């Protein structure tokens, strides 16, 4: 024995069709997520903290003597922070920085990890602690879910 129930409600069918069409093109939602996460990532530089809320390691005394200001990752040009960007392509959202040193700042590096320069000095010349700036905080996760729900009309 089987039971089949068919429900032909135009309003529900229209809503389901709308939901399906929104799911076929994620670009608008991904762009909104990109804007939100780019702003959040840039704000981490002002707070000097990781997505988890952990404070970044302070600059070493040698670094402090060579630069203006005490905040880690905030150089005079502020390029690392200012060049955080996102792109949406083929259903993917990518957030990052084009700066060649971004990965070292995010993951850290040990003295000499990248070999030596022409003068036989280690690259980098000292240990660089990881100062993660990319990733999602709990608030970011909530905001992304809100964006998804908004785009689905929930």
Label the predicted regions.
Residues 1-154:
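Short, Lys/Arg-rich flexible segments
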């Amino acid at each position: 024995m089987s039971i089949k129930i068919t429900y032909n409600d135009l309003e529900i069918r229209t809503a389901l069709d709308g939901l399906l069409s929104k799911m076929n093109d994620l670009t608008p939602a991904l762009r909104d997520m990109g804007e939100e996460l780019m702003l959040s990532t840039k704000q981490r530089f002002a707070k000097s903290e990781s997505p988890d809320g952990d404070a970044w390691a302070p600059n070493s005394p040698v670094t402090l003597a060579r630069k203006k200001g005490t905040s880690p990752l905030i150089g005079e040009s502020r390029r690392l922070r200012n060049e955080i960007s996102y792109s949406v392509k083929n259903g993917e959202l990518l957030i990052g920085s084009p700066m060649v040193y971004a990965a070292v700042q995010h993951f850290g590096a040990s003295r000499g990890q990248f070999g030596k320069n022409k003068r036989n000095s280690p690259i980098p010349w000292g240990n660089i602690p990881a100062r993660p700036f990319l990733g999602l905080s709990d608030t970011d996760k909530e905001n992304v879910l809100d964006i998804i729900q908004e785009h689905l009309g929930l």
